Amino acid sequence: LIINSFSEENTRSLKKELEVFGTRVVAISGDITQSKVILETVDAGIQTFGKIDILVNNVGGGSVSEVVEKENPLAEVEAVWDGTYAMSLKAPVLMCEAVLPHFIERQSGKILNISSMAGRPGMPHVDLVPLSSSYHSAKAGLIRYTQLLADQMGRHNINVNAICPGIIYTDGWKEISEEMVKHHPNYKGEDPREWFLGVSAGRYSEGGVPQTPMRREQTTNDIAEAVVFLASDSSANITGQTLNVDGGMVKD
């Protein structure tokens, strides 16, 4: 297994966790929006293991800019969109393009792009954070790229699918939630986790767990199970699809 994370600490920690199970792990730390880092990651996998069978693009996020230029009112907008697209769309696209020659040569491969419910039609747009519009757009772009790539790669026995996680209280969302209940006038004093899940007083009618058919949040294990299925031989004839793992929030 080869893993990459921007945080060297996170990479080391995950490597240790995986090695407990006897997994052979190559860990690389670096900015995955940079093509040099992407090529190093792919090359390390091929050199170490002789081949790559599966690519999971579990990368995303956005950029909240602190740029302030009175002479250029679009500077902040530009910085936010550039940062968000680099992380949530450009990085997974470049990673796919880097591994495709190897997959085509072997006439085999699985690609799984982790998108977001934010990129799905019917997902409500709640303008709560500065990166919202750019993030929704980038994740929608990743879904469309997945579909187009599946059309192109099917003849090479390469499956390309996407997964859209639902309501999961990740470290990133924890940080955003804490900022919202600290500074937003409508949510001050609320519990960050309850705010994120949509069960706090200020957010109950805005969307969240109470508005989903299953009435429960999702977990990282839910997403892992979906990844395992789409990476297995059981999904040999599934390609170009986007699997929502969201408790029924979006039905498209």
For the regions a protein language model found, what residue spans apply to each?
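A short, exposed helix-loop element centered on a Lys and neighboring polar residues
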Residues: C96-E97, Q147
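Short, small/polar-rich loop/turn modules that mediate ligand/substrate recognition or access, typified
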Residues: G154, N159, I238-G240
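Alpha-helical segment proximal to the catalytic Tyr-Lys
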Residues: P101, D151-Q152, A236
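Conserved glycine-rich Rossmann-like NAD(P)H-binding loop of the short-chain dehydrogenase/reductase
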Residues: L1-S13
